[in-house]
Amino acid sequence: MNWRSEHIWVELLKGSRKRSNFFWACILFLGSLGFLLVGTSSYLGKNIISILPSQEILFFPQGVVMSFYGIAGLFISSYLWCTILWNVGSGYDRFDRKEGIVCIFRWGFPGIKRRVFLRFLMRDIQSIRIQVKEGLYPRRILYMEIRGQGIIPLTRTDDKFFTPREIEQKAAELAYFLRVPIEVF
């Protein structure tokens, strides 16, 4: 979602609360729970859930391995659910031409650096960069080059949904708004 006026451009970023993350967190949780229940059932020697027959599975080595995969999957699933809950990666980019200030804000993982807030002057922006990598896993990333701070990504590095036309359009609009050149690399 974008909000734009003559002097201010605000772009909100979605973060980790994407449909695909919800899908994979659910699938991983249910699958690993199934593995753990089958491993536990093989240890106890009786079916905990009638849908998952486990009397033919010996506890050693199959039940141990399934329990291990179940526990590992639950840890990974809990990590995904935590990133969704904390909405890691969400935030906004705010460009204010009137005051000449750019603010970039992102939510991170809990701790000292949970809030990532970058603030700098517009006159320090050297260019808008587009990185294009084609092939099996195409990548199109929009960066902002800042004097003294290097390059800062403006789009998610795992976002593959931008077509070349969309990324060019976005870069052109932003470069026009900021009055800086565009570089492609």
UniProtKB/Swiss-Prot annotation:
One of its GO terms (cellular component) is photosystem I. It comes from the Eukaryota. Its main location: plastid. The chain crosses the membrane at residues 21-43, 63-85. It is a multi-pass membrane protein. One of its GO terms (biological process) is photosynthesis. It is found in: Plastid, Chloroplast thylakoid membrane. Keywords: Chloroplast, Membrane, Photosynthesis, Plastid, Thylakoid, Transmembrane, Transmembrane helix. InterPro entries: PSI_Ycf4_assembly (IPR003359). Belongs to the Ycf4 family. Seems to be required for the assembly of the photosystem I complex. This is Photosystem I assembly protein Ycf4. It comes from Hordeum vulgare (Barley).
